[in-house]
């Protein structure tokens, strides 16, 4: 059985990677990762979609996870979005306001265009 429901995963770390692998096994064909971190050297032993070379090259977690899903199953539609949104209550500079507004708007669009959302942070 194949499911066309698009899934959005906030977090491409240990939990996000394992959620994505399970979803693929259940037939989900569209997965989008959102994360702002890079793969570190301690990640590949825990995160099923990253490798040592990803840490060496400081690749983004979302990009790495999306690419790994496509290597595992080329028919999957996996996307990566890298953005940063500060924690509520944290201050930002005036020069960061426009970028923050763009990122929040992008998050709104992503959530609106996905049927299932996982918060795996």
Feature annotation, model-predicted:
Residues 1-121:
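Adenine nucleotide-associated cytosolic modules
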């Amino acid at each position: 059985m194949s499911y066309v429901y698009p899934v959005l995963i906030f977090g491409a770390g240990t939990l996000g990677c394992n959620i994505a692998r399970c979803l693929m096994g259940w037939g989900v064909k569209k997965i989008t990762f959102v994360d702002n971190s890079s793969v570190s050297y301690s990640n590949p032993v825990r995160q099923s979609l990253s490798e040592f070379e990803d840490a060496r090259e400081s690749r983004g977690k979302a990009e790495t996870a999306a690419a790994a899903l496509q290597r595992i199953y080329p028919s999957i539609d996996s996307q990566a979005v890298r953005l940063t949104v500060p924690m509520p209550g944290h201050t930002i500079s005036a020069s960061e306001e426009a970028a923050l507004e763009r990122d929040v708007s992008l998050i709104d669009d992503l959530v609106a265009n996905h049927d299932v959302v996982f918060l795996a942070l």
